[in-house]
Amino acid sequence: STFWPVHEVGRNADTFDPEGARLLAANSLLVSDSLHLHSNGRDTEARLEIGWRFHPKGYKPKYKRAQRNLGNAVDIDIKAMEKDQELHAYYVLPEHTKITTFEPHLHAPGARMCLESIWGINVQALTCAGYDHNWVRGYEYAPGYEPLLPKGTILHITGYMDNTPGNENVPDPRNWQGSGNRSVANMFIDLGHGVAMTDEQFQEAMDERREMFKLTKNDVVTGCPLCMVMPEQPTVERAQDRLTAAE
């Protein structure tokens, strides 16, 4: 089973790493109890069509889906008549991860969400995006610019909420708002995708990034805290280099 796909108002299509596509078993059933449709005050039947683009027959994914349980949809408390309210959530990556998309998921009072990574003393802003609950968007990182984050990295999202008359999505800003599936209640989640990597795959991806940008140990690349940690040469190769230099 998988939590994907998710449907939200005005949502664009999901995209995945070309080498980390989702596997859908034959004869699978699609079941969801949270389609994020706007209520209209009466019982209504709705039809939702979901389509896929498949890889060629024989395709096998190189990577598996990365875990990313980043958010809070349980104990949210949004004050009445106040903007720039902040929500925070954290998640420690259990595996080396390449993040391929960022998708802020808020509800009516949502105005903005930011994603940052924390690795030791290094804190880097990865993405910030505005939010409009009438037009929910996912953002795909360009090839070669996807964050490459080592196991143990702390992901941190910050949500900015606007529960004032200036936010036309809010029906009555005089009311406080809690958590829930309805558009007039609240969620605070990053629904983006990524792939998990083994030690070897992660090193390979960083080597490709170093080659792509011709990196040295003096450079800084946002979203790849270990890219500037250059792997040591084997002892024999180091000795040969020193011998050549001495000659």
Task: Please place each PLM-identified region on the residue numbering.
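Beta-strand-centric surfaces of beta-sandwich/beta-rich domains
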Residues: 1-246
